Amino acid sequence: MMNKESFGACLLLTLPEDVFAVISRFLSPSDICNLILCGKSLPALVDTEKMWLVQCEEVKVLPLLEIVQWRIGISSYKALCRFLVEVVKPLLGIWVQQNPELGNVVYVMPGFLSVVGCRIIPQKVAPSWIQEDRVKWSPVFEIICGFDGSNGFFLHGRDKEGSCLYPGFVMGIEKSCNVLQLDVVPRQEKSSCNEIERGASREEGEIPFWMLAFSDRKNLLNIVTSHVSLHVVEPLNEMLFPTLKYDEAMLVERRTILLKMHKFGGNWKNMNLEEDDQLCYNPMQVKINEMLENLGDDYFFDEEELIEVTPTENTNVLGESSSSKNTTPSQSEIRVSNRQSFLSSGDTFGLGLTASYSEMSYYKGWPYMHFHHFLLYKLPVKKAVDQEAYAGLWGGTIGCPAGKCPKGKTEKSLYLLMLTYEESEEHSERVLIGTKILEGKRYVRHPNGTAMFVVKIDTPSLDPFPVDANETHFENSYSGEGIAEGYSFRYTGSKPGSLFVITNDLLAFVWKETKVVITLQRLNLTEILKKGLGSCVPPLPPSKNFTYMRRSFINEFTKLSTDSSYSE
C-alpha cells in the first residue's frame, strides 16, 4: 500500500503546472527545499527556474523586471533567491547613529546584484526638490552577490589620494537584525590553497573586538583599512545602483570589477574570475602581529581618545581619567592584556560586517545607542496602514505648501522625519510623533532623535491655517505640540500647534504662536536616488565613514565648507 508521503508526492505531480505555480506562492524557500528532499520525482517539478523565479518575487524586495535583470549575472534564480532572502531583505531600511548630532542617516537599498548603504547628507534643497529628485548622498558600504549567490563586503571611504574600497567579510546576517556592526575579525590561515578558509572560533577567555578600548579598536581598523584599500575612480564609486545615467552594460562591468577586486585585491586588472583559486595570498587580510613588531606597543596609545570611553568600557578596560598619567597600572595592564588576547586569536585579520538582533529600548521611536562602538541602528520605520495612515518616512522644509507663502530664500534646510504612532502615557490616547532623523543646517540646536511635534491624532484642531489657503483643501487637522526651547532630544520644550492634512502624502505642522510652518511630503528614497539627478559627495575616511564617533553639532559629511547647500 502506498504510504501517505508517497501519496502526497504523487498528488503534487498530478497538478497542472500553472496550478502548482499558484500554490508555490504560499510556500517559503525553506518549504521548497524540503519538498526537494521528499522524493526522487519532486525535484524535477519543484527545483526549477520558474519555481525559484516565483520565490524571488515573493521575497518582495525587487520588482519582476529587476529580478530578471539580476538573473544575467548569477547562476540561477535559486542562487538569487538565496541572496535576496539572506542579505537584501534583512538589511533594507534606514540605519542611524547618534553622532554627529546633525545627522547620520544611512539608507540601505537594492543596488545591482547588490545591497548598498548610502548616507543622506545634511543639505539645503529647493522648494521643488522632491519633484526634481535632487538629493546629496555619499556611499558607505555595499554587499555584492557572487555568481553562486555568495556575498562579498566592501566598505567605502577615502584617503589622501582619493576614494577607496575596502574589501571584507560578511560575518552573519540575522533575519530580524537591528544592529549593524563593523569589526576587525580574526581569521585562520589556509593550510592549502584549495582549503576553505573560516573565521577563527572564539575560545573561552578570548576577548571579542567590541570589548577592546575604543582607541585600540579605532587603531586596529585604521591598520586593516590602510592595508586592504583599493583606489577607485569616481564613476566606479558612484555607480552603486541603476539610474538614468548608467545603462545595464555599465553596471555589469562595474560588478565584474568589484568581484575581481574582492578576489584578487590590487592585482585584479591582470586576473580573470574564471581562473582557478590558486592564490594563497588573501588580499583582504592583514598579518597584524608581524606589523606590530615594528610599530611597538606605543602605537596604540592615544591620549586624546582615552577620554572617549563608554561606562561599559570603563569597567572592563579603562578608567575615567583624562590623561595617561592618571591611569592606574592595573587598568593599563587590563587594556594591554585584552588587546594581546584579541591579537592572538587569529593568524590574520580582516574587516567584518555583522548584522544581528539586539533587544533595545526606544524613546519616541529613537533607539538608545552605544556612542563609542562602530554600530548603526535600524529605525523601526513602519508602513502606512488604515489605522496609521501617516506612518513612515517624510521629508520637508520650513515653509508653507508651494504657492502659499511669501517669496523668500530659494533653498531651505532639508528635514527627514520618521512618523510613528504611540499610546500617550499620560492620557491613554493615540499620538502621532514626528521624530527628526536629519536636519540640513550647518549647525544644529536639537540632535537626532528629537520629536519635532507630537499630535493628538484623535483630537481635531479648530485653529486656522496661518496664510491664505482658499485654494487648498485640508482633509483633517489635529491639535498637538511642536518643539520649542530646551536641550537634548529628551528635554525639549514645546508650544501648541496643529497638524494640517492636505493629502495622505502632504502634511503641514504649524506652531500656533509663531505661525512657523514645516511642510512634509511622504518619501520613497529608493525612487528618488534611482533617478540619478542628485549628487554624490565623497565619503569620509573609512572608520569615520561607517560611524562618526565624535559628538559634533556641525556637518561632518562634506569637505566643501564653502558650499552654500550646507549653510544656515
From Swiss-Prot:
Residues 315-337 are annotated as: Disordered. It comes from the Eukaryota. Residues 321-332 have a biased composition (Low complexity). One of its GO terms (cellular component) is plastid. Residues 9-55 form the F-box domain. PROSITE patterns: FBOX (PS50181). InterPro entries: At5g39450-like, F-box-like_dom_sf, F-box_dom. This is Putative F-box protein At5g39480. It comes from Arabidopsis thaliana. The lineage of its organism: Eukaryota, Viridiplantae, Streptophyta, Embryophyta, Tracheophyta.
